[in-house]
Design a protein with these regions (language model features):
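Enriched for short, Lys/Arg-rich terminal
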Residues: 67, 71-102
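Short, hydrophobic secondary-structure boundary micro-motifs
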Residues: 29, 50-52, 91
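Conserved amphipathic alpha-helical interaction elements at protein-protein interfaces in regulatory
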Residues: 15, 19-22, 41-44, 48, ...
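A short, surface-exposed loop/turn module that caps and links secondary-structure elements
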Residues: 37-62
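Arg/Lys-rich, positively charged N-terminal/basic patches that mediate binding to nucleic acids
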Residues: 1-32, 102
Length: 102
């Protein structure tokens, strides 16, 4: 299964990479590697992560205090947020697509 990032989630990813690059050389790259590994994992096992709100699942990153918040759609995963675990919970909820008939 493939994935796509919400525009705001993509911006969060870019911001986090820049933040970690500012902390230490190469740290942003390590963050990106962790995000890519988590993305590949949920593409392979889309229902592995727990549902935390409606249909949204959270895949916690291995080495950083972030989670990928995503929805399993019929033919893809839709990543709605690259959320820092200390950030206001549910700030991304308005990014979740509406489901018809449910």
């Amino acid at each position: 299964m493939k994935s796509r990032f919400h525009e705001a989630a993509d911006a969060e990813l870019t911001e986090a990479v820049a933040y970690y690059d500012g902390k230490a050389a190469g740290l942003g790259d390590r963050f990106l590697v962790d995000v890519k590994a988590a993305t590949r994992y949920i593409e392979r096992y889309p229902e592995i992560a727990s549902v935390i709100d409606r249909e949204v699942r959270a895949k916690v990153l291995t080495r950083f205090p972030y989670s990928l918040m995503y929805v399993v759609e019929p033919h893809q995963l839709f990543i709605v947020a690259v959320a820092h675990q200390s950030r206001r919970p549910g700030y991304w909820v308005n990014r979740v697509p509406e489901r018809s008939g449910g």
